[in-house]
Amino acid sequence: MSVTVEVADEETHDVPLVEQVRTTPDQNVDVKVQENNVVTTKIGPKLETIPAAKMQDDNGDEEKAENSEGAAAEKVEKQHDDDGVVVHEETDGVASSRSSHHDKQKPGETKKSGDGKMDDDDIITTARSSSRRICGSAASSSDSETADDAPLLPDEGPSHAVRLEMPGDKPASPHDRFPKTPLKTLVAFLMLVVAAAGNTITLSWIHERYPLTPPLPDIVFELIPKIPWGLRLCENLMIGSFVSLLVLILFHRHRWIVLRRLCFIGSILYGMRCITMMVTPVPKADEDFECSPRFGENATFSLIVMRGVWSMFGLGLNLFDNQKVVLCGDYIYSGHTLVLVVSALFIGEYSPRRFYILHWLSWLVCSVGVIFLVLSHGHYTIDVILSYFACTRVFWAYHTQAAHPSIRLSVQNHQAKEFWFPLLRWFEGDIRRPVPRRFDCPISYSQVCNAFRRVRPRGRNGAARPAFE
């Protein structure tokens, strides 16, 4: 359907009307149907009902209607003047005209020329075509927020292309192939080593400062009697869970990425633990636990650092106390719970979904280890709770950002305010989607054959002997 609009001159102060097929009483429009298949709309002071003229039958001459449409369009193009510019557009077969005139007219108002009569410029000629639904203006009575023809978005600014990342999509570029980037993994591993060393050095310093007072009140300590062997059981479960995680990473197809994330998240958690231990030293949770003697007045910075580095080789566990360095005061928050929870989170995230038994088993081991840790008075209950929340918040926040670049690159991402977010963007800059849960052998069969292949003996002159003589 083609629609043309005539622009009135400045003397009559007429304003071109926005094209609209739907006629409503609010706009006070009269419609006349002519015999030449052209609908003429005239603006009047009131709504008049005029019977329709003769309509062409189905066997009429279609060429005559097309010629009349073309003539009407050419007529409007020749009548534009300097006060208004008519722009003809056509979208999906519908022609429209827009004017740059700045005057506006309210719906229902009618303007007249100097002699009080209607001008010919107030007539809008539109060509009738097949029934078609076009969105009306804001003055239309059918326009509302729930109307079917209401626009979905307001046309207030330039549109922006949005790309939706689908998990099942095939890689669209080489960046989606999960590069190994061992350099980034090495950087994350060094960060973990620095954080672990800082933990032990901080613990060595706290060992000289923690208060020698009775344990703080704890509801679990009051209700349940102490289980002395609970701490050793917790550490055994912790070692088994962490070794299982390392085996999972070893056989994961994207082992470099998983190992890098483990080291980076571990460095964040151990770094925050250094701060919490330092700011609030608390007394021992177990009065019967024997700690190494303090330096006292002979304490120096070098002695404290060397003792912390030496205790790091024991991994902070009581199972490896052959060096006779047992430090106390590392309570807020629990490092044992940190290892148990992080191991369970990584096993559940990167193992196949159908291995639900493994997922339940990992969380069962974590729960049992944490329970016996508290029952043995190895940690306060608040230490375990804070450690769980710290581990889960950091893990879930990191993996949400890493798996969805649209969130990571958004300007409205509030998690970008985290202190570790710039490092996340560098570590995960080449990751465009979630890491798939796929596995393979780290050493291929051909590599094994090449390693154990029989080397041909060489002669005296250095030339290789034939395989068969």
Swiss-Prot record:
EC assignment: 2.7.8.27
Pfam families referenced in this protein's UniProt entry, alphabetically: PAP2_C
Segments for region (Disordered): 40-177
GO MF assignments: ceramide cholinephosphotransferase activity; sphingomyelin synthase activity
UniProt KW Transferase keyword: yes
Gene Ontology CC: endoplasmic reticulum membrane; Golgi membrane; plasma membrane
Main location: Golgi
Record keywords: Golgi apparatus, Lipid metabolism, Membrane, Sphingolipid metabolism, Transferase, Transmembrane, Transmembrane helix
Domain of life: Eukaryota
InterPro entries with a match to the protein in the record: Sphingomyelin_synth-like, Sphingomyelin_synth-like_dom
Xref: PANTHER family: PHOSPHATIDYLCHOLINE:CERAMIDE CHOLINEPHOSPHOTRANSFERASE 1, SPHINGOMYELIN SYNTHETASE
Name listed for the protein in its UniProt record: Phosphatidylcholine:ceramide cholinephosphotransferase 1
Lineage of producing organism: Eukaryota, Metazoa, Ecdysozoa, Nematoda, Chromadorea
